[in-house]
Amino acid sequence: MITIIGSGRVGTAAAVIMGLLKIDTKILLIDIIKGLPQGEALDMNHMSSILGLDVEYFGSNEYKDMEGSDLVIVTAGLPRKPGMTREQLLEANAKIVSEIGKEIKRYAPNSVVILTTNPLDAMTYVMWKSTGFPRERVIGFSGVLDAGRLAYYAAKKLGVSPASILPIVLGQHGESMFPVPSKSFIHGVPLSRLLTEEQLKEVVEETVKAGARITELRGFSSNWGPGAGLALMAEAVKRDTKRSLIASVVLQGEYDVRDVPVEVPVILGRSGVLKVLEIELSAEERQKFMQSVEAIRKLIASIPSNYLQ
């Protein structure tokens, strides 16, 4: 069974897409708002019936109902509002994530955890600490979304399908993240050879600012992109596809970084992160990567210690 904690826009989008992809036959929605997850589950069950899907949705306000889940997806947290940075969400969401982590440890101690709560990398650290799980089973979602956005904007410039691009985005899910055109390929040819310097600059800027742009346009943050990315990660875990994806994971010596969650390429399977892939970076790329790592370190250092137990 897959449990999704948080029945807002991202959680429900993920639930719908996972149902359409038939990733599991049982999907549980948990939320603190009475009636919300139950109503969403009922509506989704009607969808399943109409489409002939062998997927059943459940709604609950009780964490104990996640017992037996092998995958827990956490989308709960305060949303990012127009003009708000991810860092401003830090303390409030650290409290929420810490409390949820303890409940996951209690009721789903063998699960793989994927979370979307912002600021993402710092919240991945909070979840890792509060559950006490191995780093392989606590995964920050954002890299799939960032890589997908890079592929979209690069494809628009080149007039090709986004599916033909293998994108790499590293660092923090936030203002210091950086796409790596020299390591993003179309059939072995890097984007840095296919796009002009000006085009590359535009693609990178569009990728970094994509989330804020969506929020500016409609007044609330993205949900369909994150929902699709979560479904892709859930599929890798549930079906043990051993697929390479970009995800935020606590590094333990890779890239000469320790105890900091950072967006990097990983192999994802049934037990979570099976391998962290280390790609060769130029001196300039490594400098940007380490700047991103330091930005995450500063966020982690500002988290109250009582949320890290």
From Swiss-Prot:
pH dependence as annotated: Optimum pH is 10.0.
InterPro entries listed in its UniProt record: L-lactate/malate_DH, Lactate/malate_DH_C, Lactate/malate_DH_N, Lactate_DH/Glyco_Ohase_4_C, Malate_DH_type3, NAD(P)-bd_dom_sf
Top-level division of the source organism's lineage: Archaea
Any GO molecular function: L-malate dehydrogenase (NAD+) activity
Binding site for NAD(+): G6, S7, G8, R9, V10, G11, D31, N93, T116, T117, N118
Reactions the enzyme catalyzes: (S)-malate + NAD(+) = oxaloacetate + NADH + H(+)
Pfam families reported in the protein's UniProt record: Ldh_1_C, Ldh_1_N
A single BP term in Gene Ontology: tricarboxylic acid cycle
Residues annotated as the enzyme's active site: H173
Enzyme class: oxidoreductase
Annotated binding of substrate, by residue: R80, R86, N118, R149
Reported temperature dependence: Optimum temperature is above 92 degrees Celsius.
Entry EC number(s): 1.1.1.37
Membrane spanning stretches: none
Keyword annotations of the record: NAD, Oxidoreductase, Tricarboxylic acid cycle
Family to which the UniProt record says this protein belongs: Belongs to the LDH/MDH superfamily.
Subunit relationships: Homotetramer.
Role of this protein: Catalyzes the reversible oxidation of malate to oxaloacetate. Exhibits higher specific activity for oxaloacetate reduction than for malate oxidation in vitro. Has a strong preference for NAD. Can use NADPH for oxaloacetate reduction, but activity decreases more than 90%. No activity detected with NADP(+) and malate.
Name under which the protein is recorded: Malate dehydrogenase
Gene label: mdh
